[in-house]
């Protein structure tokens, strides 16, 4: 059963939440982060992308970057932009996108639950990305970005959160330029905290929706702290990592599309003929071909959009991973036809997440005379089944929207 405990969040003072809240560090590039930081001195990107406050030639993984992140975090606390609560609390975090509401609870998951697979994963991580966040967490002495978790809520837990919302005023309520509304309620009542903790203990598993690298890094820092503190009790803050848990059926997964920069030395005609071996192909004149069901793909190649429907032998009788559209595409097109052996490391492939328009795929493909593929979104049910079976998805199979903002909650590793 899941351990999910209250904590003393370091969080924006009243009136500062909208200015502080920032997209996750890995959603914005260096130039975008620098532009945001230049306009907004309170943006949490000064912590999560601290290279913006160093000379432009500074390497992203230089020790100076992590030290600057630590300095910037301390400065935000010293100047009163961030203030720590004086007792452990839970926090309701509600996001509204295009009229759809998702309501989660912020707290701290256990590194032991991660190690024992109560916190379930569905993706591999890259060691270089892990090391970056390990250094960031360790030097800052804090989890600065929440892990996006999902689970099957109990009815009582949902009722507790709704009741608290009705009876209390939100601490934060702001809408950002992307028209996503963020609301936070602080649950500081002892009885409510105890009830929520009890309900969380009834939940058998938590699923990482987004944030595999942040989670793995937080756990490794926790294990490092245990080695440094052999008399640890398990109650120390470093035994836990910052998370927000949502009901799985409230989450939205968008498509994660692919663009390959060339045709692997082949002609357009050769590529089309090879793809026809495994797909029923229909040309779609004049506009992007958006897949409307599982096992359908949109493809843009040489000025034309095509709708591809996988032949049944590609997925019938396969396990849940083998039936994923991202796996089918890798197994019969990206690998054997286009030569993308390892999509994690091959620089010829670009992944384009969720909210980007299909016209952008077309533009990217045209720039290098490559090919683009639009996928149908993976379902939460497939994600959870894969995690339950301890299997792994291909990289970049899921794109969650809306993204949780960093800076709304910080979990200090020394309490």
Regions found by a protein language model. Name each.
Residues 1-415:
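Surface-exposed, charge/polar-rich loops and edge strands
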């Amino acid at each position: 059963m899941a351990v999910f405990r209250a904590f003393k969040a370091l969080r924006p003072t009243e009136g500062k939440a909208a200015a502080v809240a920032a997209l996750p560090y890995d959603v914005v590039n260096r130039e975008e982060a620098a532009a945001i930081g230049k306009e907004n001195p309170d943006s949490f990107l000064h912590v999560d992308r601290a290279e913006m406050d160093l000379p432009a030639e500074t390497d992203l993984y230089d020790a100076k970057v992590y030290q600057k992140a630590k300095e910037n975090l301390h400065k935000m606390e010293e100047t009163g932009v961030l203030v720590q609560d004086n007792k452990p609390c839970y926090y309701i975090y509600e996001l509204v996108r295009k009229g759809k509401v998702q309501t989660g609870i912020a707290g701290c998951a256990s590194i032991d639950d991660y190690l024992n697979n109560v916190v379930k994963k569905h993706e591999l991580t890259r060691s270089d990305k892990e090391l970056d966040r390990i250094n960031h967490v360790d030097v800052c002495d804090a989890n600065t970005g929440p892990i996006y978790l999902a689970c099957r809520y109990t009815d009582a837990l949902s009722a507790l959160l709704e009741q608290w919302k009705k009876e209390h005023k939100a601490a934060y309520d702001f809408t950002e330029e992307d028209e996503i509304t963020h609301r936070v309620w602080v649950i500081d009542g002892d009885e409510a905290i105890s009830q929520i903790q009890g309900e969380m203990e009834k939940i058998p598993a938590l699923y990482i929706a987004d944030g595999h690298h942040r989670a793995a890094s937080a756990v490794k820092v926790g294990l490092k702290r245990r080695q440094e503190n052999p008399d640890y009790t398990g109650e120390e803050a470093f035994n836990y990592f910052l998370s927000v848990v949502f009901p799985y059926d409230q989450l939205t997964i968008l498509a994660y599309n692919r663009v390959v920069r060339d045709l692997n030395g082949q002609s357009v005609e050769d590529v089309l003929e090879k793809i026809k071996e495994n797909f029923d192909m229909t040309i779609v004149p004049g506009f992007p071909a958006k897949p409307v069901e599982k096992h359908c793909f949109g493809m843009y190649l040489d000025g034309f959009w095509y709708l591809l429907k996988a032949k049944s032998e590609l997925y019938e009788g396969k396990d849940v991973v083998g039936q994923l559209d991202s796996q089918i595409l890798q197994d019969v097109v990206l690998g054997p036809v286009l030569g993308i052996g390892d999509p994690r490391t091959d620089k010829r492939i670009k992944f384009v997440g969720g909210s980007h328009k299909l016209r952008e795929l077309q533009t990217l493909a045209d720039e290098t005379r490559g090919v683009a593929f639009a996928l149908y979104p993976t379902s939460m049910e497939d994600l959870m089944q894969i995690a339950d079976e301890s299997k792994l998805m291909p990289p970049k199979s899921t794109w969650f929207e809306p993204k949780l903002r960093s800076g709304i909650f910080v979990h200090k590793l020394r309490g």
